[in-house]
Amino acid sequence: MAAIRTQSLTKRFGDVVAVRDVNLTVEEGEIFGFLGPNGAGKSTTINMLLDFMRPSEGTAEVLGHDAQKEPRAIRNRIGILPGGYDLYDRLTAREHLEFAIDAKNADADPSELIDRVGLSQEDADRKVGGYSKGMAQRLVLASALVGDPDLLILDEPSSGLDPHGIREMRELIRGEADRGTAVFFSSHILSEVEAACDRVGIMNNGRLVAENTVEGLRELTGASSQLILKVGRVPTELDLTSIEGVSGVSVDDSALRVSFSDPGKKAQVVKRVDAATRITDIKSEQASLEELFDSYTRGEEPTGRKPESPAEVSA
């Protein structure tokens, strides 16, 4: 059973089509990144999944239930971290969690939830009016985890967190997915989406323009991977473009930059270069999710690269 499934999901506001014919599937235990520029239709789609808004056409199913016809069957099985939320300044974090546990009629320990999101027990007994943005974000996430939901819907979960907190958030999300929870989240920090997600969907102008793994998006856009080989001497007689799967070669000082339409040819290129000159360093690069996002939302071909771990060369 899919955690989320939409068919021809459409929402109109008068003459404006905010979401058009969206067909989306998120599987159980999957971490799915939901991306798009402002005004692309992400929030409207999420609101229809949560039955905060009714579709003009099409259907949305959440955990096997129709989101509009069976919302009560869904509510206690999902956890939500909304983009905008209000906390009660005069209540402590522990009191917030006790309220959330009662509201869901769940069997949960506030102290365990507090530990799970990286808050201290001392902080849990402070009034949240003095909390930082990052601490408030952790508290709302802890509330979302009440009852061990089958689906987490997270809007900008890393907002307000420092790098350490972002890493902890990523580990927490992965841990929930390992337990079988589906995680559906939107974020503007594309590097975090790339690091955490199994698949991504990209919305643009109300349409779902892409739904794939990050590597699958690279293949579909034709975003070539590259090797940068630093050499002791650039051999003028070396011909790498004759290798099928090599799409281009350029020279930058003492480095060869080789682009590939078929990344499987990298080893063959390294072997040929190594036979002609001394290789001092190798880096492998590929288009980042940010560049792929630009390619789908602006119609630009991804050109920049994001380093992978260095390759190893044997003489």
PLM regions with names:
Residues 28, 121, 231-233, 262, ...:
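Non-catalytic surface loops within mature trypsin-like serine protease
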Residues 261-315:
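C-terminal coupling/interaction segments
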Residues 2-6, 11-185, 190-204, 210:
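ABC transporter nucleotide-binding domains
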Residues 102-106, 198, 222, 278, ...:
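Non-catalytic alpha-helical coupling and interface elements of nucleotide-dependent molecular machines
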Residues 65-68, 208, 232-234, 261-264, ...:
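Short, surface-exposed acidic/glycine-rich loop or hinge patches that mediate macromolecular interfaces
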Residues 79, 140, 174, 194, ...:
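Signal for well-folded cores of large energy- and translation-related assemblies
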Residues 171-260:
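ABC transporter nucleotide-binding domain
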